[in-house]
Amino acid sequence: MTTPYEPNYFDPLSTDRLTNIICEVFEHQPLVPMTLEMEKFGGSGLYAIYYRGASIELYAPLKNYEMPVYVGQAVSNNSTTGKGVKSRTPLHGRMSQHRRSVSDAGLPLSEFFFRALRMPDVHANLGEKGLIRGYRPAWNAILSGFGSNEQGSATRASAKSKWDTIHDGRKRTYGSEPHDRAKLVTEVEQHILERIAAYDDLPWRRAGTNV
């Protein structure tokens, strides 16, 4: 008589395993104040923006958590054509662009922080998707438009983004303003509380990161 038996399956290079490793290593990188004037550095990679202050009531619940408000990547190759990007400093450039956006919107730079990690595009893509899926950062999930670029008349004719509706001030022009600011504020408030409740559920979370 045979005994039912099936060995466990293990794939050390599975997408989920690689994603968790990338996210864990990323979260061991230091938080860098957005006020820091960074010298240019080369390379592409993964980055996130964190709020650790108290003056913006909307984001104040995040101050004791290393929970990003925005996650993105800066690539070395165009995903459509496969050609290399013109800049040799795409990660630095993207972080500098976001710093200007935060400043132009009148938000306190001293209360925002960067975290970044240089890596190949394929791994940055995995990390970006993993962090966004896990944390659902407010500027990715609710207040879309933060990372967009203004590009000529087509963009100027488009609707004002949700992010710019809440954080007005960037030197851009828009064709319409369709979003209700009060409704967006309520959505963000509820969303942040929900994400804080799930803060320790992520597979790569390390103990003791909330300070």
Residue ranges of predicted features:
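Boundary/linker segments flanking structured domains
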Residues: 1-69, 73-211
